[in-house]
From Swiss-Prot:
Organism: Bacillus subtilis (strain 168)
Subcellular location field: Cytoplasm, Nucleoid
Chain's role: Multifunctional protein involved in homologous recombination, DNA repair and competence. Can catalyze the hydrolysis of (d)ATP in the presence of single-stranded (ss)DNA; prefers dATP at least in vitro, catalyzes the dATP-dependent uptake of ssDNA by duplex DNA, and the dATP-dependent hybridization of homologous ssDNA (strand exchange). RecA-ATP cannot catalyze homologous DNA strand exchange; SsbA and DprA activate strand exchange by RecA-ATP. It interacts with LexA causing its activation and leading to its autocatalytic cleavage. Recruited to repair centers (RCs), foci that are the site of double-stranded DNA break(s), after RecN. Concomitant with the appearance of RecO at the RCs, RecA forms threads that extend from RCs toward the opposite cell half, possibly searching for sequence homology along the sister chromosome. The threads disappear after about 2 hours. Thread formation is absolutely dependent on RecJ or AadAB. Thread formation is also dependent on RarA.
Other notes: There are about 4800 RecA monomers per colony forming unit (CFU) in untreated, exponentially growing cells. Treatment with 0.6 uM mitomycin C fully derepresses RecA expression to a maximum of about 26,000 monomers/CFU.
Name assigned to this protein: Protein RecA
Chain ranges passing through the membrane: none
Classification via NCBIfam families: tigrfam_recA (TIGR02012)
Disruption-associated phenotype: Cells lacking this gene are extremely sensitive to DNA-damaging agents mitomycin C, methyl methanesulfonate (MMS) and 4-nitroquinolone-1-oxide (4NQO). Double rarA-recA cells are much less viable than recA deletion strains and slightly more sensitive to H(2)O(2), MMS and 4NQO than single recA mutants. A recA deletion suppresses the lethality of pcrA DNA helicase depletion and increases survival of the strain in the presence of H(2)O(2) but not MMS.
Pfam hit, one: RecA_C
Amino acid sequence: MSDRQAALDMALKQIEKQFGKGSIMKLGEKTDTRISTVPSGSLALDTALGIGGYPRGRIIEVYGPESSGKTTVALHAIAEVQQQGGQAAFIDAEHALDPVYAQKLGVNIEELLLSQPDTGEQALEIAEALVRSGAVDIVVVDSVAALVPKAEIEGDMGDSHVGLQARLMSQALRKLSGAINKSKTIAIFINQIREKVGVMFGNPETTPGGRALKFYSSVRLEVRRAEQLKQGNDVMGNKTKIKVVKNKVAPPFRTAEVDIMYGEGISKEGEIIDLGTELDIVQKSGSWYSYEEERLGQGRENAKQFLKENKDIMLMIQEQIREHYGLDNNGVVQQQAEETQEELEFEE
């Protein structure tokens, strides 16, 4: 063994002794380099994310205009985590969570941890404590814009507090990012949109809370309403576009189109018809939709209603879509799961 190697081994032993086992290692020695995921609650979004869902141990920012469906997207993620037996927490800085609506989306409100903090510092300290416990699978902060620094709350209405919120977010994310990765917690930060004054060229829109969240986020989702969904004269919901603006774990800039129905959340039937038609699993002739020999209905809304009433056919179409994109029932990319299984068998 060379002197250089002996010196390196001694340094590694010293680092492990001081900071604990696993604090430094060769990348090839890492037990699992693949990213574990949790389904988003939307098949279209799972495919747009490229890895079959939200990556564990990462920060995700969901932003968009008012009433675009940001909280709905986050609540669907909570419902999916709970269905897998995980623990979820919702930090409601806006004090606007509707428990009845959350329950309709599949959230178990009896088990959901809820905090409605008074200040931004309190909200982020609660988030840090939950993440460091290692017992929470997903933490949602709604929203970054509502994280008001203590100095601003205690000050007078006309006082200027330039950069306080940005400084608060920057400090919090520096502390949180490492803990989130170690605990494999999914941290979803919901954010609003503001207009920059005096912008003549380019996009005048920006998100509050400074630049730190943009840097620390592994995934950034932009949620926007595209059009209203009507039944006669009644508005039943909105067609919503979710764009993956940033993605550190798969190719970015993919878009998912979903139907967000009032009182129901993301329509699984709608996205199955859209994805099925796109992949030619569902055939469209004129305004009629059909699957193999079965006619689903005339018009998209009738076809959606048919799938709602015939869950067996819906599941068959869903399985074929998952198979095409290489997703299993948990949203995990099938190829990754098979490779992991092969490695385990080889080790045995």
